[in-house]
Amino acid sequence: MERPPNVEPCNTEVQSGGRGITETRHFLGPTPGRVTMTYNTRIEPDRIRVYHRGRLLSETPGFVAGNGTMSFDWNPPPGGSPEDYVVTVEVMGTPGSPSTRWDYGIGCPGGRR
């Protein structure tokens, strides 16, 4: 199954900076399994949330600075369309902060490549 356009694959690292909220969509595919994310929000605290179709799957414990790991169970609906296998990762910088730098990596379910 091909991923939808403008959607990143899993096993991808995303980097950014600036202010406000950054949303990136990732295709995890139809195979269920545990998904692990690593992140580095550096000095300026950021909040990271992962959503599937508007439902929160995982999040950092508020605004955090530094390295961390988070994970969630991926249980996609069987027989879905490619959009059913997409999650949205939302990174929000500290409100009022002029800039922030961060990166994260999101793995594939069950550690597959």
Residue ranges and their predicted role:
Residues E23-R25, G68-F72:
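Short strand-edge motifs at loop-to-beta-strand transitions and within beta-strands
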Residues G33-V35, E44-I48, W102:
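Short beta-strand/loop motifs in extracellular/secreted proteins, especially
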Residues Y39-R42, G93:
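Non-cytosolic beta-sheet module surface loops
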Residues I43-S58:
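Short, surface-exposed beta-strand/strand-loop-strand elements in extracellular ectodomains
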Residues W74-D84:
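Surface-exposed, short loops/turns at beta-strand junctions within beta-sandwich domains
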